[in-house]
Amino acid sequence: MARAAALFSLATGLSRIVGLLREVLVAYVFGVRGAINQFTIASQVPNVVRSLVADAALGAAFIPVFNELLERGEERRAWRVASTVATLSFLGLAAVTGLTMVFAEPLLGVFYSGAVPHLTVQLMWVLMPTVVLLGFAGIVQAILNSLGEFFVPAVAPVLWNVVIAVGLLYAITVDEPSTALLVYAWATLAGTLVQVLLPLPWLRGRQGRLTIAFHWRDSAVRRVFVLM
């Protein structure tokens, strides 16, 4: 337990250090004003959607239900519930993401008094899929935490920051500010994908059995969404 706590603290500290490096690179590449404001605005909509439907609430609602089923010896049902929650969450978030991308310009219009720059719309299109990816990642990390694995979920944000930092280093070589911003956005999406994929081998190592499932009539599935 002490070793696990030490590794978790190490990963958390490393994540903060790399995150600080990422912010330094952002300031170096784009400055603190000007073009970077378009990225900041473009990220507001996915951030709001995440905070409403895909952030910590889903994991917090899922963990007690999943743990309760495991403690009662209902392991097969626990994984069935986990698979259903993951499937329904993925489809729901994908639908929300798709609608948000379709109506990107009017949604971003609340931040502008005039016309919305096309670059801001492009940036939002690139960033919106992070909502789906982080929603799924939250479920995987919640499962690992329930199974006593804390280090890997703590390391995932480190690699997220590293991937973005690599993208920013490449952006330094780009002369066109709009292209550099798109590189930053794509690096953010790529980092989020890495954050999703990293824990999956450990999930399989814990006999994780996430599959596509639609057992929405299960009372445990309904409890998860009610608790959200």
PLM features: residue spans?
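Membrane-embedded alpha-helical bundles of multi-pass transporters/translocases
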Residues: 1-228
